[in-house]
């Protein structure tokens, strides 16, 4: 079985990735300090993957998540991590007070590189939802405020979330690509 180094320090993301593509590749984990750049979701994902491939010297998988509020024309987008750290769940929810739309799009972009010097390949998944007051456990990013069909990600079981999430949709594309590449 082929091995891929998933570059993350987030144990929850690692568990989700292993649960979804672990039957196709051996997902190992490494933590690499990657510079935070500004740009589009795709530019950020590619640069992060290039940097990780150079640091590891082999095949890597990186992931970047964005949460865009429709009322704010896609913000906070790829900067959601910093907005969450600064404002918390309730603060993110309050950002939409005064707007008609509480709609949001969760975007997950996986980037794969076979190694240094190779152009990263992107796999993207998107899920539409709404921003709500926090519900459910607050142990995984913005899951408590992103509602999909009546439940926040935080209220769902891991199995339920892994069937509909933006991360799942991106990983299915990656999984299919890996199956095609490895056969």
Swiss-Prot record:
Keyword Transferase: no
Classification via SUPFAM superfamilies: ITPase-like
Highest taxon in the source lineage: Eukaryota
Gene Ontology biological process terms, A to Z: deoxyribonucleoside triphosphate catabolic process; nucleoside triphosphate catabolic process; nucleotide metabolic process
Main localization (coarse): cytoplasm
Reaction(s) the record says it catalyses: ITP + H2O = IMP + diphosphate + H(+); dITP + H2O = dIMP + diphosphate + H(+); XTP + H2O = XMP + diphosphate + H(+)
Chain sites annotated for binding Mg(2+): 36
UniProt-listed InterPro entries: ITPase, ITPase-like_fam, RdgB/HAM1
Record key words, sorted: Cytoplasm, Hydrolase, Magnesium, Manganese, Metal-binding, Nucleotide metabolism, Nucleotide-binding, Nucleus
Annotated residues for binding of ITP: 8-13, 48, 64-65, 81, 140-143, 161, 166-167
EC number(s) stated in the UniProt entry for this protein: 3.6.1.66
GO molecular function per UniProt: dITP diphosphatase activity; ITP diphosphatase activity; metal ion binding; nucleoside triphosphate diphosphatase activity; nucleotide binding; XTP diphosphatase activity
Cofactor note text: Binds 1 divalent metal cation per subunit; can use either Mg(2+) or Mn(2+).
Oligomer and partners: Homodimer.
Role according to the record: Pyrophosphatase that hydrolyzes non-canonical purine nucleotides such as inosine triphosphate (ITP), deoxyinosine triphosphate (dITP) or xanthosine 5'-triphosphate (XTP) to their respective monophosphate derivatives. The enzyme does not distinguish between the deoxy- and ribose forms. Probably excludes non-canonical purines from RNA and DNA precursor pools, thus preventing their incorporation into RNA and DNA and avoiding chromosomal lesions.
Family statement: Belongs to the HAM1 NTPase family.
Protein name listed in UniProt: Inosine triphosphate pyrophosphatase
Organism field: Emericella nidulans (strain FGSC A4 / ATCC 38163 / CBS 112.46 / NRRL 194 / M139) (Aspergillus nidulans)
